């Protein structure tokens, strides 16, 4: 993503602009937005890595009902995550391209909305 673009740009690689166009086209991490995961018990999660968050169960409601439930505050927040993100992510100039990256890693440290602890960009690169 952004790291590859910045490295290509630093090296004067002619593919830098193509990389930027490609990463600009998808809007970054889309967990809980454009895709989710259903585990073997029928539980619906934002992705296959965030098993600690469950939105419902397909044995009780259809996936469509679960995924579009306007009363599920966490699911709705994930779909509008940019206004909830904290720390480095909230201030990052690349937020539109990575979308806060991987929420499961932040959740593993206790706060789904905190910065991704494995962000590969330096403080200088996010400003």
Regions found by a protein language model. Name each.
Residues 1-18, 43-93, 99, 104:
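C-terminal accessory region of radical SAM enzymes
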Residues 38-39:
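Short, acidic, Ser/Thr-enriched surface-loop or helix-capping motifs
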Residues 21-22:
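Active-site-proximal, Lys/Arg-enriched surface segment
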Residues 29-32:
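Short, small/polar residue-rich loop motifs at catalytic or cofactor-binding pockets
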Residues 77-81, 115-127:
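Short Fe-S-cluster ligation motifs
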Residues 105-118:
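Short cysteine/histidine-rich metal-coordination sites, predominantly Zn2+-binding motifs
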